[in-house]
C-alpha cells in the first residue's frame, strides 16, 4: 500500500478531468499492488467544495473513491477485498456497475459487472 503524505483539498478535486478519479484513505490518495476495490454506496456532488466536505465525514473518511464524469463528482464509500470472486459478490450485493482491480494494467483495471 502506498499512501500519499498529503491530504487532498478542493484544488486537487477541481483538477480532476472527466473520467479521472482517486481512491482515498483518511483523506490521502492511496494505491495498492493487489486486491479489488468495491463501492458499497455513494453520493453525487456537483462542486469540489461539496466533495471536500463529504470526504471529511465519518462515513467517508476511512476509505472512499472519487471520480468525475460529465461534471458530476461521484463519491463512494469503498472496501478493498483480496479476490475478484469476493469483489464481484460484494459489488452485486451493493448494486454496483463495476469493480476496480489494483494489480491490473490501468487500461484493464475496471471490471464491469
Predicted region positions:
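Conserved, structured core segments of small domains
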Residues: 1-113
Amino acid at each position: 500500500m502506498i499512501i500519499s503524505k498529503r491530504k487532498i483539498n478542493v484544488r486537487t478535486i477541481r483538477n480532476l478531468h472527466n473520467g479521472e478519479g482517486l481512491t482515498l484513505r483518511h483523506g490521502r490518495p492511496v494505491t495498492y499492488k493487489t486486491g479489488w476495490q468495491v463501492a458499497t454506496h455513494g453520493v453525487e456532488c456537483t462542486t469540489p467544495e461539496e466533495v471536500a466536505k463529504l470526504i471529511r465525514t465519518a462515513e467517508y473518511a476511512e476509505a472512499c473513491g472519487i471520480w468525475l464524469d460529465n461534471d458530476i463528482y461521484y463519491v463512494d464509500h469503498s472496501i478493498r477485498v483480496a479476490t475478484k470472486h469476493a469483489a464481484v459478490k460484494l459489488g452485486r450485493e451493493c448494486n454496483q456497475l463495476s469493480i476496480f482491480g489494483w494489480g491490473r494494467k490501468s487500461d484493464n483495471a475496471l471490471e464491469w459487472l
